[in-house]
């Protein structure tokens, strides 16, 4: 006789075991109609699952975040149903939920095409219209093996082998199609109407490039049409803002097969890169950092001593010379410890703050490379602070404020911060972890902003704070970090002399604000759709003549703008002024200056912005002041 306690405290008694759906029906037909699953004693279960004893129950509907995830997971199974009807010879692998969607990996003798994807989506809609029930059957292990053996689903059998402890498994039947899953899933296909397949890509079995290649079909699903439409609109906008397309259109950079994951910066893109570097150099100098430069290639023994060889070897590029093995550095930290170790350090010398625009290389899988967002060769605004345990709090607090100020300069006000604390496997004693975690939490509280705790997500060598930016499309990008490290200073023999004339290891704080320059520039390109604020624009002003008689005056204006530190060019082509304005507008140049006979005679310029706003006629000095004012405001200034 189970007694069910609902979220509002109401209780319902039943004479016998009762399913989640039956409880929903006892509350009302409207709720039952919208029941996707249930949360029984804080565990998600299927709507058909029985409750046999007293329990708490929350009915999950499409309005709940869990309901949306269940809809997405069930849509992945629906992909399997449609694919097996259209392509019976393929083998289904795995179909998990991901952020804002789902995918299904499939082994197919031939790659799927966009036409295939359209056919799969159409078949999915036909199946949804059949309004069939999804049937769950808990099945003994041997029967599950027999089921998938009969169906020739070898990948499912391999997955079963990975779960030797499971004596029975959930099989979900979509009519003649069956899939294996822990669930829960929707009770009926009526919940799956608001979906769309989005793309096809390649993947590897178990994510290992040494294994066979699979076809991955991506999709998204939502609880209603409006949410789906809004998502599709965001995706379309994101495609328009794709940094690879804009990078090509604005002549910023290119990638090519001969150097996978390495960026060929063009003059325009390199100007943006240099603006970032010069800005960050001044920020670091103003905040007590010493800029250093360390080698690109270092003997492999250092990486063995630091622990990177044991844990990171697959991602390291290596080389050999004169009987010695070397690695191209994937990160700067061990090298910065070598700089710190030169000369005896006293507690009076701490903190020591080292910074480097460190060029690093990591052997990322070719399938994961993505424009300049995911590369093999990159530069970090890397820094390491060597301090005492007592100095952790102040150093972290100062870094948080510095990071938030930098993000504001780039136009990012919405910053998410997460504190990751001790994992089960870790180094260092608990008192040190207590101190470090409290120091980081107190520093976050002092910043006066909300932050999220991630228990157990810290690195084995210390807790960390991660900083993530939200862009104009609502996408979240993890960029900055500060991490306490109790391990590397010990491994690499870093020490200082204490006030008691004893030797002690410093705490090492790994920190970065932008992260990878390449990735951060990619984020900026997509955030601004290439319409960079004046301080980052490769060309800040273009001076154009109406007829040949103003050509010399245009060149003189450009020369004066350059003398004042502006990035300016001229356009003296024998084209109509309207054509030149349109073309330079497409290049996202913030300011377009036009000279006719009147402007030449008066020594003025007619100024308009790339958005078409006419700022009128002004002196050259006034225009210089206008641009310098805009540059001083950095990302806070919007060119209208």
Curated annotation (Swiss-Prot):
Chain coiled-coil ranges: none
InterPro entries named in the record: aa-tRNA-synt_IIb, aa-tRNA-synth_II, aa-tRNA-synth_II/BPL/LPL, Anticodon-bd, Anticodon-bd_dom_sf, Beta-grasp_dom_sf, TGS, TGS-like
Cellular component terms per the entry's GO annotation: cytosol
Reaction catalysed by this enzyme: tRNA(Thr) + L-threonine + ATP = L-threonyl-tRNA(Thr) + AMP + diphosphate + H(+)
Predominant location: cytoplasm
Origin: domain of life: Bacteria
Class in the EC hierarchy, top level: ligase
Cofactor note: Binds 1 zinc ion per subunit.
Protein's job: Catalyzes the attachment of threonine to tRNA(Thr) in a two-step reaction: L-threonine is first activated by ATP to form Thr-AMP and then transferred to the acceptor end of tRNA(Thr). Also edits incorrectly charged L-seryl-tRNA(Thr).
Protein name per its UniProtKB record: Threonine--tRNA ligase
Organism: Acinetobacter baylyi (strain ATCC 33305 / BD413 / ADP1)
Classification of source organism: Bacteria, Pseudomonadati, Pseudomonadota, Gammaproteobacteria, Moraxellales
